[in-house]
C-alpha cells in the first residue's frame, strides 16, 4: 500500500462540490471512480479543502492509498487518461509517508476570488468569474479588508450550514487589487468557515460600490450575526489556490 499526495486542478462548474453528494456529481467521486477503473480498488481521496458547488481549484491537495504498484508518473498518466474529458487534471503527484494527511497536516490554505468589473456580459469567463457591472473602488475595498485581518468571531461571514465547532478564526491575509478590468481578492488562513471567503468578498463589493463604508464592514463583523451580512458573492469567481504543509 502506497500513499500518494496529489495536486489537482479543476473547473467546478459541472460539480456539486468536492465532497461526494447523494444528489449530484462531485470532484471526489470523479477521481475515485477514475482510480477504480485502472486499479479495481475502492479508494477514498481526501482533500485539504472541500469546495462548494461551482467553486474551482488551481492546486487542490489530496491524498489516496493505492495497493497496485505504481510510480507517481504512472499514476498521474493513468488517472488523467481516465478522467478525460472531465475538467479535472492531476498536475502533481508524489509518494508521502503513510501518516501524511492532506487535511489534518495542512497548516495554511489560500483562496483567490476573481471579479470582472465591466458592463459587457462575460463570454469566455462565464462561470469562472463574477461579473460586476458598476465600477469598484479597489483602494477602498483593500483598506476596509484590513479590518478583517487577525483573530475574530466570523459568525457574520459563515453559512448557517457551517459545521465548524467555533466561528473564531485567524485571517492571515486579505488583499484586493486591480489588474485591468479584473479585481482579484486573495485570502489566506490556517482554515476557513463555510462561505467565509464568498461572504467577505460580497461585503467588500458593497464597500467598492460606496454602499458600505469601512465602518459598516467593521460593524457587520462585530455584530457576529449572519443577518448583518451585506451580500454573499456567487461561487463562480472562487478558486482554491494552495495548501501549506510543514
From Swiss-Prot:
EC number: 5.4.99.12
Enzyme class: isomerase
This protein's name: tRNA pseudouridine synthase A
Coiled-coil region(s): none
Family the UniProt entry places it in: Belongs to the tRNA pseudouridine synthase TruA family.
Residues engaged in binding substrate: 111
Subunit structure: Homodimer.
An annotated Gene Ontology molecular function: RNA binding
Gene3D superfamilies referenced in this protein's UniProt entry, alphabetically: Pseudouridine synthase I, catalytic domain, C-terminal subdomain, Pseudouridine synthase I, catalytic domain, N-terminal subdomain
Function: Formation of pseudouridine at positions 38, 39 and 40 in the anticodon stem and loop of transfer RNAs.
Pfam family, one: PseudoU_synth_1
One BP annotation, GO: tRNA pseudouridine synthesis
Active site, per annotation: 52
Disulfide feature: none
Catalytic activity of the protein: uridine(38/39/40) in tRNA = pseudouridine(38/39/40) in tRNA
InterPro entries named in the record: PsdUridine_synth_cat_dom_sf, PsdUridine_synth_TruA, PsdUridine_synth_TruA_a/b_dom, PsdUridine_synth_TruA_C, TruA/RsuA/RluB/E/F_N
Gene: truA
UniProt keyword list: Isomerase, tRNA processing
